[in-house]
Amino acid sequence: MVRGNPALPPNMSPVTDSRFQYLELGGKLRRPTVVTAAESTAARRVSFRLAETIGSFGSQLGQFSAPVGIAVDPDDCLYVADSCNHRIQKITPEGDVYGLGGPDWLLHPQGVAVDGARFIYVCEQGANRVQKFGPNGQFVYRLGGPLASQVRFASPTAICLDSYHHFYIADTDNDRVTCYTATGLWYMDYASPTKEIAFSRPQGVAVDLEGRIYVADTMHHRVVRLSAQGKPDAVIGRPGPGFGELTEPCGLAIDLDGGLWVADTGNDRVQKFTADGEAVCCFPQAPTPETELHAPRAVAADSAGSIYVADTLGHRVLRLQSAGMEW
């Protein structure tokens, strides 16, 4: 089940530095691992292995407290919505770490996206708003929030971009996905597109290269695919713990092959589907202490084919690599 926003332990307080800038951490964070998992035996299924573990529990740079959202920029830098530390962390491929935000600027950030110009989009569940920042952390604009008169979000939890730099927000408690242009102008709402397809607390959204929109219809335990015109044309998954089944799915990502990755949060795993909904991978299949996931809430893909998983209640990020295909 989705467990919400875990509180910080009594002996730990969030980062208090309210300066809105990047702060560099000396040394390197990322540590490669060699654990192999998610081996698959079914026909045409692919397998992925754990290649790297990033971060641990805490409030220092390079540590996480309930990482909920992740994104990768064109330079393969990783961005993590470090929710209970009220910040975004940027981690370079070399392992350098930078922090953006603090409790005076961000309140429980849930989703993060980065465009081709390295502008950063953050949705804050705690403030019911979306903020846009420049590549160096400078404020650009915000939408929503407690004083907003027109834009009203209710627990926005995920955000993604399309090839036109439109951004899509999973506006969870409004049971919709809403779309804005890069300049912050409203473009379109996707809410209960048909009587048969009515969203219930959607907590993930992704757009593929063809403009099709994938919505994690979380409390209906499925993913709904919409055409570029917003018409539902496929339902992926069904409720349950089995292969290809979903329990409260959250984050979504499209990989290099056009495959759909789903953070199957309630089943403590991630799964890959083809664009048409055929399940082809599950991680982990045989959990070990190194590979076990705890309510993962987000997934992202980089330009080399690696998959990143926000292991939310494990307070870390895992990087997965392909281990090949078994027929």
What role is predicted for each listed range?
Residues 83, 125, 164, 172-173, ...:
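Short loop/turn segments immediately following the C-termini of beta-strands
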Residues 72-75, 114-117, 161-164, 207-210, ...:
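Residue-level detector of Asp-centered blade-edge/turn motifs that repeat once per structural unit
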Residues 295-327:
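Blade-level signature of beta-propeller repeat domains, shared across WD40, Kelch, NHL, RCC1
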Residues 33-68, 79, 95-108, 139-155, ...:
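Gly/Pro-rich loop segments of beta-rich domains
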Residues 77-79, 119-121, 166-168, 212-214, ...:
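Conserved beta-propeller blade signature
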Residues 2-47, 325:
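Sequence/structural signature of beta-propeller modules
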Residues 96-175:
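A generic tandem-repeat structural signature
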